[in-house]
Amino acid sequence: MAHIGLNEDEARKQNLDVIIKKLPVMAIPRAKTLGETDGLLKAVIDKNTGEIVGCMLFAPDASEVINIVAMAMKTGQDYTFLRDFIFTHPSMSEALNDLFAL
């Protein structure tokens, strides 16, 4: 499990207009090859700016994948950076393409 930034409730309490994206781990090819398909990836995105304001990962290798999201957030990238980034296949990080596909 890994988390960065705001969760959905925290974002709404700050009056942010957010888009919530979810991806079940069973949809990730690498999770299938690992035989670990339980879990969920969830992203909180500011609808007006495209900024990633939070991300929660309940998945294999979450402690590694969250670092990629953190880097995107800290360098001011919007969600399209991770949506369009080319990741190796199969990898847990490639799930970020699907998570951030709006």
What residue spans do the PLM features occupy?
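Flexible, glycine-rich terminal cap/loop adjacent to redox cofactors
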Residues: M1-N7, R12-L102
